[in-house]
Swiss-Prot record:
Protein name: Elongation factor G
Coiled coil (residue ranges): none
Gene Ontology biological process: ribosome disassembly
SUPFAM superfamilies: EF-G C-terminal domain-like, P-loop containing nucleoside triphosphate hydrolases, Ribosomal protein S5 domain 2-like, Translation proteins
Keyword GTP-binding: yes
GO MF assignments: GTP binding; GTPase activity; translation elongation factor activity
GO CC terms in record: cytoplasm
Highest taxon of source: Bacteria
Similarity field: Belongs to the TRAFAC class translation factor GTPase superfamily. Classic translation factor GTPase family. EF-G/EF-2 subfamily.
Length: 698
């Protein structure tokens, strides 16, 4: 028997809550769950019992790491909430959740306005075309400034954001909001945890200001809507419904961002923002079709939410759940799926059986018989599916483009304390790398040492912590190492010739390769320019393979060689002695021989670092950035503090948190995010080579 869909598609919202760390994102999500009847006790992040932050590490650090997907109900709408992390080290989680949600709420701290990580997540949301509304949170704090926060959206994000509300009071006197569309005031009763409020006419002392702001709002909407513009210029009355419809249309087109005010912690304004989610954010029917590819023909296929079409979904997160084991979070784009049925993992071309389907609520779950298009659910039983895989109807395979995964920039060695720990660690690392594609683990074949790499120190700290807590692995952690790279800066032609004659079958491979630098980020490219069969067809893939393998260990200090083009243009072979293996070796010799002539350099990751400090410490802070080989990119003022933008090599940033704390008496903060690779200065390059050589020579 077919199961019935509980909420129609137009009454479904898939949203993310995006913010800078500490802007109050988890508290905001908590309140949404509380007011939509999903939790009965409010948890505070800073007390460590928030409902969304369900991994122990998150509880300890009071930050949100994993995007848990939660289902809530507001009025007669279903809202699926993807909780996204606010810390830079977890940007992949944010990217991943942006892929599967249709709209987002950006939470700002009313004291700080737009902060560095807000800029990062905002840019990512632009990339994925996600419509947003903005919630200016923490209006109860001293120094809260709603207007300045709205202004920061224009100045720092170039966003056409406009208030649809005006706060009544701020800091201690913040008691509610005025709705500029319906021209009413929502005033809260302190004692009722925000679940009770009175909607009253706009108080007299706010009337004039509210009308002025309403007029500004209408003008802003008129700029993006011709219908409203015509009425406005003609002096005609614009109804509330017309205004809301125009705001919705412009918001869905990414031309307008409605701004709300509130205090999640003090339980004010969250319900009105929820109304905004329903009024202005898209349902799965409003978003532009999702583009997939037919693996057989390569043709593009547009997916619109429709339960009757063949099933297609994206696996966007793998989590290891203490109760049910391996849990795969999926977003369904078309069709429906019943528990117990088979799907095709089109990315791996393998059939998988879905055991059970769960609707997730932060850390409790409800089993459901079927999941429909536009929905988000957890699936149990998918053994081979990893993040970014496409799950489809076995008769209609499709590839839903996979996520772009950034390369890790930092590495540490992990040494298990005992043989038993070694076995447990292997299992732990396999599980953790499955869950998080930006986390890598590899064993150095020469030293037998295990190296883990990730997006920052916090990222690796948390992974090590999880190994200990979830898998009982006791391990010693080495000093963080930078993920250096190597590249060529000049063109160089070189021969690689491998000849071995010693009784029986010999070995013979001979190649001439022209190496040229490739554009940054383009990686390795191989070109076959052999004419007249001087290197037989069957050996050419071996040359390509030999180069790729040799490039993994670089030419200077054993770091991967990147961004190089290699053109195979000449060579020779021996009728009897030539083999694939011989040409592989010949290719690696050509690479070695080219290194000296090609101006090989070591590249280091350069981080975009933003430091916020009270003005009195500015000199010290700037001095410490310069001392770390940093280059200043500019400065701005923010809420009585100075914000310094700079680029600093990652190798110089270890331990910076401690330095900054002591030089600003704990008042300075910084964020850093990987920006680009750049050649290291000669002296530092020599040091790195010496250090690596010293290790290799032991």
């Amino acid at each position: 028997m077919a199961n019935k869909r509980e909420f129609p598609l137009d009454k479904t919202r898939n949203i993310g809550i995006m913010a800078h760390i500490d802007a109050g994102k988890t508290t905001t999500t908590e309140r949404i769950l509380y007011y939509t009847g999903k939790i009965h006790k409010i948890g505070e992040t800073h007390e460590g019992d928030s409902q969304m932050d369900w991994m122990d590490e998150e509880k300890e650090r009071g930050i949100t790491i994993t995007s848990a997907a939660t289902t809530a109900q507001w009025k007669d709408y279903r809202i699926n909430i993807i909780d996204t992390p606010g810390h830079v080290d977890f940007t992949i989680e944010v990217e991943r959740s942006l892929r599967v949600l249709d709209g987002a709420v950006t939470v700002l701290d009313a004291q700080a306005g737009v902060e560095p990580q807000t800029e990062n997540v905002w840019r990512q949301a632009e990339t994925y075309g996600v419509p947003r509304i903005v919630f200016v949170n923490k209006m109860d704090k001293i120094g809260a400034d709603f207007d300045k926060s709205v202004k920061s959206l224009h100045e720092r994000l170039n966003a056409n954001a406009h208030a649809v509300q005006m706060p009544i009071g701020s800091a201690d006197t913040f008691e509610g909001v005025i709705d500029l569309i319906n021209m009413v005031a929502d005033v809260y009763d302190e004692d009722k945890l925000g679940s009770k409020w009175d909607t009253i006419p706009v108080p007299d002392e706010y009337k004039e200001e509210a009308l002025k702001r309403r007029n500004e709002l209408i003008e802003a909407v008129a700029d993006v809507d011709d219908g409203i513009m015509d009425k406005y210029l003609g002096g005609e009355e614009i109804s509330n419904d017309e205004l809301k419809a125009a705001i919705r249309k412009a918001t869905l087109n990414l031309e307008f961002f409605p701004v709300y005010a509130g205090s999640a912690f003090k339980n004010k304004g969250v319900q009105m923002m929820l109304d905004g989610v329903i009024d202005y954010l898209p349902s799965p029917l409003d978003v532009k079709p999702y583009v997939a590819h037919d693996p057989k023909t390569g043709d593009e296929v547009e997916l619109m939410a429709d339960d009757k079409k063949p099933f297609a979904a994206l696996a966007f997160k793998i989590a290891t759940d203490p109760f049910v084991g391996r849990l795969t979070f999926i977003r369904v784009y078309t069709g429906s799926l019943q528990s117990g049925s088979y799907v095709l993992n089109a990315s791996k071309n393998a059939r998988e059986r879905v055991g059970r389907l769960l609707q997730m609520h932060a850390n409790s779950r409800t089993e459901i018989p079927e999941v429909f298009s536009g929905d988000i659910a957890g699936a149990i039983g998918l053994k081979n599916t990893t993040t970014g895989d496409s799950l489809t109807d076995p008769d209609h395979p499709l590839i839903l483009e996979s996520l772009q995964v950034p390369d890790p920039v930092i590495q540490v060695s992990v040494e298990p304390k005992s043989k038993a720990d070694r076995d447990k660690m292997d299992v732990a690392l396999q599980k953790l790398t499955e869950e998080d594609p930006t986390f890598r683990a590899e064993t150095n074949p020469e030293t037998g040492q295990t190296l883990i790499s990730g997006m920052g120190e916090l990222h690796l700290d948390i992974m090590v912590e999880r190994m200990k807590r979830e898998f009982n692995v006791e391990a010693t952690i080495g000093e963080p190492q930078v993920a250096y790279r190597e590249t060529f800066t000049k063109e160089a032609k070189a021969q690689g010739k491998f000849v071995r004659q010693s009784g029986g079958k010999g070995q013979y491979g001979d190649v001439w390769i022209d190496f040229t630098p490739n554009e940054e980020g383009k990686g390795y490219e191989f070109e076959d320019a052999i004419v007249g069969g001087v290197v037989p067809r069957e050996f050419i893939p071996s040359v390509d393979q030999g180069l790729q393998e040799a490039m993994k260990n670089g030419v200077l200090a054993g770091y991967p060689l990147i961004d190089v083009k290699a053109k195979l243009y000449d060579g020779s072979y021996h009728e009897v002695d030539s083999s694939e293996a011989a040409f592989k070796v010949a290719a690696s010799l050509a690479l070695r021989n080219a290194a000296a002539k090609a101006g090989a350099v070591i590249l280091e990751p350069i981080m975009k670092v933003q430091v916020t400090t009270p003005e009195e410490y500015l000199g010290d802070v700037m001095g410490s950035i310069t001392a770390r080989r940093g280059s200043m990119e500019g400065m701005e003022d923010r809420a009585g503090a100075k914000v310094i933008n700079s680029f600093v090599p990652l190798s110089e940033m270890f331990g910076y948190a401690t330095t900054l704390r002591s030089s600003t008496q704990g008042r300075g903060t910084f964020t850093m995010v990987f920006d680009h690779y750049s050649p290291t200065p000669k002296s530092i390059q020599a040091e790195i080579i010496k250090k690596r050589g010293g290790e290799d020579a032991e």
